[in-house]
Amino acid sequence: MQITLLKGKLHMASVTQAELWYDGSCAIDKDLVELAGFREFEQIDIYNVDNGERFHTYVILAESGSGTISMNGAAARKVQVGDRVIIAAYGQMNEAEADEFKPKLVYLNKDNSVERTTNTIPVQKD
């Protein structure tokens, strides 16, 4: 049986641009793409923490070190510059692979600099 697990995420990224008339996609700083284990043209989910919007798009590369998170095309209507978003990618694997798999979790500061990286999320307590 195949199951779908979180492969990687950029947590609390700040939207730096919203370009309605650019080809649809999400441009992400190449360094952040690599840290999260994303691939160019990979499908991603965007969860807008500020307004609750959730949508799919795909990754395109922005300049390394730029901190760019740009929602383009129709996705630009789902955000405002400065919104905080979670960008997630998922992968399918069998249960044996899932037992050994660790996601790439990248936590960002407001300026999209890396606060920390990890591969676990602590157990939620009351």
Curated annotation (Swiss-Prot):
Quote the subcellular location field of this record: Cytoplasm
The reply on keyword Protein biosynthesis is no
Q: Which UniProt keywords apply?
A: Autocatalytic cleavage, Cytoplasm, Decarboxylase, Lyase, Pantothenate biosynthesis, Pyruvate, Schiff base, Zymogen
GO molecular function: any one?
A: aspartate 1-decarboxylase activity
Q: Which cofactor does it need?
A: pyruvate
What EC numbers are recorded for this enzyme? 4.1.1.11
Q: How is the polypeptide modified once translated?
A: Is synthesized initially as an inactive proenzyme, which is activated by self-cleavage at a specific serine bond to produce a beta-subunit with a hydroxyl group at its C-terminus and an alpha-subunit with a pyruvoyl group at its N-terminus.
- Residues the record lists as Pyruvic acid (Ser) modifications: S25
Q: What does the note under cofactor report?
A: Binds 1 pyruvoyl group covalently per subunit.
Instruction: Give the main EC class.
Output: lyase
Q: In which pathway does it act?
A: Cofactor biosynthesis; (R)-pantothenate biosynthesis; beta-alanine from L-aspartate: step 1/1
Superkingdom of the organism of origin: Bacteria
Reactions performed catalytically = L-aspartate + H(+) = beta-alanine + CO2
UniProt-listed NCBIfam families: panD (TIGR00223)
Q: How does it assemble?
A: Heterooctamer of four alpha and four beta subunits.
Question: Know the name of this protein?
Answer: Aspartate 1-decarboxylase
Gene of this entry: panD
